[in-house]
């Protein structure tokens, strides 16, 4: 009897280990469409199509961040940290911008319209934003030297000068190439 019990113990411990659940994008789809993609497009959520998603670990903590893309006609995409059922937007982009990934950070660089450039960065630790920076610049595209009409820089939600902002961005280092495995959204 003892021999049988000893042989069964390894099998029992295997069956008690937590099984990782497959990721269910549908749990987040409506929130992504209505709170993030739809406002970015200024279209109705019925016209906005999410094409695919990928799970990537930006900060190397073993927890994946969610990267979602719209179809090519819309070209919206967003990167989110996941905390249970809640999402935190880390960066989003449209046809006039791009997502950039750094070691432990993600951001976007955008040409919103002729004469406006925006960029923002989120630095992560344990899948939470620990610091951030934003820049917005508007300039007169009709002037000969494209005179700057507005410049704004923030680091951790505080206005800073251009040098302080540039120091933050330089600490991010170079962008890294990410080739995520994309999964279709049904």
Language-model regions: role of each:
Residues 4-14:
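Sec-dependent N-terminal signal peptides
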Residues 19-60, 69-71, 164-186:
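Terminal domain-start segments
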Residues 20-27, 109-186:
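Acidic, small-residue rich beta-repeat scaffolds with periodic aromatic anchors
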Residues 60-69, 104-110:
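Acidic/hydrophobic-patterned starts of short beta strands in beta-sheet-rich repeat architectures
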Residues 63, 73-77, 92-93, 109-120:
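Short, surface-exposed coil-to-beta transition loops
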Residues 75-77, 87, 104-107, 117, ...:
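Hydrophobic residues embedded in beta-strands of well-ordered beta-sheets
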Residues 76-91, 122-125:
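Beta-propeller blade repeat segments, especially FG-GAP/WD-type strand-to-loop junctions
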Residues 94-101:
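Repeated scaffold domains used in trafficking and secretory/extracellular systems
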